[in-house]
Amino acid sequence: MHRLYIIISYILIPLIVINTYIRILKKKEDKSRYRERFGITKIQKPKNKELIWIHASSVGEFKSCDFLINNFYEKYCILITTTTKTASDYALKNYSKKIIHQYAPYDIVLWVNKFLDIWKPKLVIWIESDLWPNTIVKLRERKILSIFLNARISPKSFIKWKYFSSYYEFITKSFFAIYAQSENDLNRIKTLTNVNVNFLGNLKLTKKNSSFKSSFTENIRIMIASTHQNEESL
C-alpha cells in the first residue's frame, strides 16, 4: 500500500508544481519562500543546538504547541513547520525570536529527504491531524523519534480510514506515543491501530493540563538525552 502511495505521489509532481505557481499568482503562497515546499531553504541549521521539529499545519494547531516552544527554545533549536501562509505569518509575528519557521515540504520522498538532510531533527512532534505518510515513514527509517500530540480524527476521516486501517497502523506505528485530545478520538484511533495511545485532553481549550505539560516536557528531555546516549554507544 505504501509503495503505491509513493508511486502516486511521484506521478502527481507536475500537478503539485503547477498548483504551487497558481497559488503564488493568487498570493496564497509566499513567493519568496515557496522553494521550502520542495525541501530547499536559505537558512542554515544552527550547529550549537540539537533540533526539535514541531509540525503544526494551521494557526489553531500552532497554538497547541505554545508550551513546548516556551519550555525548549533556550536549550534546543525549535523548527516549526506549517502549510498555510496565515500560520507562517502568525509564527513569525509572535515567535520569531524563539523559533525557525519553514513551510513543510510536500510529501514527496525526494523533497522530504532534502528537508531531513538539512535539518536532522532529534525529535519530531506532530500536532493534531496533519499526517504525511512519506515523511513519517522516512523519520522511522532514519530512527528519528516521533510523537503525535493532541491527536484527533474526525468521524468522517475515521470512516475513510476504516477501509485502510492496516495502512493507518503502518503509518502510526512510527510514533513512540500518541496523545489523543478527546475520548472519542482515543477510541477511534485505538480502533485503527495498536500503537500506544493515551488520553490527554484538548490543549487548545483548557489550561487544566499544566501537570501534563510539565511531565511531558520532562519526558521529552529524558527521551532526547536517551537518544543521545544511544548514539554515543554506537
Question: Predicted regions span which residues?
Answer:
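Charged active-site motifs of nucleotide-sugar-dependent glycosyltransferases
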Residues: 47-52, 217-223, 232-234
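Alpha-helical scaffold segments in soluble metabolic enzymes
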Residues: 10, 188, 234
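Membrane-interacting alpha-helical segments
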Residues: 1, 5-8, 12-19
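N-terminal start-of-domain structural block
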Residues: 1-7, 225-228, 233-234
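Active-site and donor-binding regions of nucleotide-sugar-utilizing enzymes
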Residues: 20-39, 45-212, 228
